[in-house]
Amino acid sequence: IGYLNNGEIKKANSNQQTGLTSFSNGTIVGIAMDLDNNTVQFYINGSSTGNTVSLTADKFYYFGTSGYSDAEHQWNFGNGYFGTTAVSSAGTNASGIGIFEYDVPTGFTALSTKGLNL
């Protein structure tokens, strides 16, 4: 499943949603995966975009990846940095685990060993 920079959400190479917020350099894309209910919600600069998308429940592995020619991609799983740049606003996080640029959606926490047992 992926959120493309032109505002499309694709799953298994099939459009799930189109006409959503597009993005370019400097955009922060947030991903909230709910593996109890098998859904994912995307966020653009802290605001949800589109509807939640259903995930396949059984026998799938999910991993983060990004790609675009001649582009640099940085991930923050709660350490408070994108590469060597610290987040500027440190949004709230109900679990107190992780530092993010924007507020973490209710019921979600950092993808880390500390957040697995909540």
Cite the ranges covered by each PLM segment.
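PRY/SPRY (B30.2) beta-sandwich protein-interaction domains
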Residues: I1-L118
